[in-house]
A protein has these predicted regions:
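Juxtamembrane cytosolic amphipathic helices that cap and anchor the N-termini
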Residues: 7-18, 210-224
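Extracytoplasmic
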Residues: 14-48, 66-69, 235-240
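Residue-level signature of mid-helix packing/kink "hotspots" within the transmembrane helices
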Residues: 31, 59-67, 152-153, 261-269
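Extracytoplasmic gate region of multi-pass secondary transporters
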Residues: 33-37, 215-271
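Conserved MFS/SLC helix-loop-helix module at the cytosolic interface between two early adjacent transmembrane helices
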Residues: 64-102
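Cytoplasmic helix-loop-helix junction between adjacent transmembrane helices
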Residues: 109-146
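Helix-loop-helix hairpin linking two adjacent transmembrane segments in secondary transporters
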Residues: 144-192
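Flexible cytoplasmic inter-helical loops of multi-pass small-molecule transporters
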Residues: 188-207
């Protein structure tokens, strides 16, 4: 940590730490919310497709929102977008604790997905990526991804313990309120955004998208991430309930999700560090 601190100006260093905490909170409980699937579906008499559809919409909107939020943040500042996302996500999760109509519950996936997408680490990168050196950006991205994975590692067991001790209704409201912890952290990110900016914007958002998708390598990378995300989201959604169906304790399902996050931490650090030294295409192929 001391070596990392020496590599950055103080304002940027604290912004990186704040950004990692934002990533930890925003991804942690949203990625592990599937531990609520079985108890909620059983108590409310729903088929699992209700909960699954809501999570599917959440994942879709999370992906769609991030580039739009990043583009807006690039022009108007990351702190506004992150604040909106934190509040919107908190509202979405709170609604899940009080809306017991199947259709309305499914629709909360839109609110939560937009909120978590707007307060995800890529939005923080919009601010930090302009004030760190180009060679440091790979490391910062790896660090932020590792923080998100750490959130998943902690979120699933914590949520499961809360469900067992205070019930899923109260646990949901604690999850919702955790997103409000993001708001005071935005002070540090806004300070970094005020540092001298070496990044020059030469194209608008539409042009940037056209340029990106005209590149074969980017298109292949895009669909590679799509396939990866599809499989991981499927596992995140259904693994905890499946493990309980097989007669194991709920905490076993939670720790199964947590292990995915744990090993992703190591992978994120390793890929972020390696990306500063070795060829990124070769690393992706390996």
């Amino acid at each position: 940590m001391a070596d990392i601190k020496k590599s950055f100006e103080p304002a940027i260093f604290y912004a990186i730490i704040a950004g990692c905490v934002v990533s930890f909170v925003s991804f942690g409980f949203s990625a592990s919310f599937s531990v609520f699937l079985r108890p909620m579906s059983a108590d409310l008499g729903w088929g699992r497709e209700v909960f699954s559809l809501s999570l599917a919409i959440q994942a879709l909107m999370w992906g769609v929102t991030q580039p739009l939020a990043g583009a807006y943040a690039d022009k108007h500042g990351s702190t506004r977008v992150l604040a909106f996302g934190a509040i919107f996500a908190a509202l979405g999760f709170a609604f899940r604790g009080v809306l017991f109509d199947e259709t309305l519950f499914v629709l909360t996936g839109f609110i939560v997905g937009i909120g978590t997408g707007a307060c995800s680490f890529p939005v923080v990168i919009v601010a930090l990526g302009k004030v760190v050196e180009a060679k440091q950006r790979s490391f910062i991205m790896g660090l932020g991804t590792a923080a998100a994975s750490a959130g998943m590692f902690a979120g699933a067991p914590i949520a499961t313990i809360l469900i067992g001790s205070i019930g899923w209704g109260s646990a949901i409201f604690l999850v919702a309120s955790s997103f409000l912890l993001i708001l005071p952290l935005l002070f540090f990110i806004s300070r970094a955004s005020g540092q001298p900016n070496s990044f020059k914007e030469n194209v608008n958002t539409i042009q940037a998208i056209k340029i990106a998708f005209s590149d074969r390598s980017y298109t292949l990378l895009f669909f590679g991430f799509f396939v990866c995300g599809f499989h991981v989201q499927f596992i995140q959604t259904h693994l905890p309930a499946y493990i309980i169906d097989e007669g194991l304790a709920p905490i076993v399902g939670a720790w199964s999700l947590a292990l995915i996050g744990l090993f992703n931490i190591a992978g994120s650090f390793l890929s972020g560090w390696s990306g500063q030294i070795y060829s990124k295409p070769k690393l992706l192929a390996g």
